[in-house]
C-alpha cells in the first residue's frame, strides 16, 4: 500500500465524483433537483466548505479501502468495487433522504442513477491508479 498512490487516487476520485455529480445534477437532472423545493438549502446559502470536507473524507476512505483489498485486479474489479460502494453508501443514503426529506420519487431515482454512475466511475479511476501496484515483499530479517 503506497500513500502516494492512495493520495493520487483520492484526488482523482474526488475530481471524478465532482465531474459526474456536476454532469448529472448540473445538466441532466436540473429540473428534478430544482423541483426539490424547500428540502435543500436555497441557492447561495449552501455550506460548500463542510460539504468539501465530507467529499475529501469520502474520497480518501474510498481509495484506502480499495488499496487494502482490490488493487492489481484490473478495471473490472474497480467496477465491482463501485457497485459495492453504491449498495453500501448511495442506496441507503438516497432512500434515507427520500424517507425523511421533502423530495419526490423523481429526485430519488435520479440520485440513485447518478450515485451509480459516480460509484462506477470512481471505482474505475481507482482501478487505473492501482493497476500494477508494486508487490509487497517480505522484510529482510
Model-derived features: positions:
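Juxtamembrane/disordered regions of integral membrane proteins
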Residues: 1-141
Amino acid at each position: 500500500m503506497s500513500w502516494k498512490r492512495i493520495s493520487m487516487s483520492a484526488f482523482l476520485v474526488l475530481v471524478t465524483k465532482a465531474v459526474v455529480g456536476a454532469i448529472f445534477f448540473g445538466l441532466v437532472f436540473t429540473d428534478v433537483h430544482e423541483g426539490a423545493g424547500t428540502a435543500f438549502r436555497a441557492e447561495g446559502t449552501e455550506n460548500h466548505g463542510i460539504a468539501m470536507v465530507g467529499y475529501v473524507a469520502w474520497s480518501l476512505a474510498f481509495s484506502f479501502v480499495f488499496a487494502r483489498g482490490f488493487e492489481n485486479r484490473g478495471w473490472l474489479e474497480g467496477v465491482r468495487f463501485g457497485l459495492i460502494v453504491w449498495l453500501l453508501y448511495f442506496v441507503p443514503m438516497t432512500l434515507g433522504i427520500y424517507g425523511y426529506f421533502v423530495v419526490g420519487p423523481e429526485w430519488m431515482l435520479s440520485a440513485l442513477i447518478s450515485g451509480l454512475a459516480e460509484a462506477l466511475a470512481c471505482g474505475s479511476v481507482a482501478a487505473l491508479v492501482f493497476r500494477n501496484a508494486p508487490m509487497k515483499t517480505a522484510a529482510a530479517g
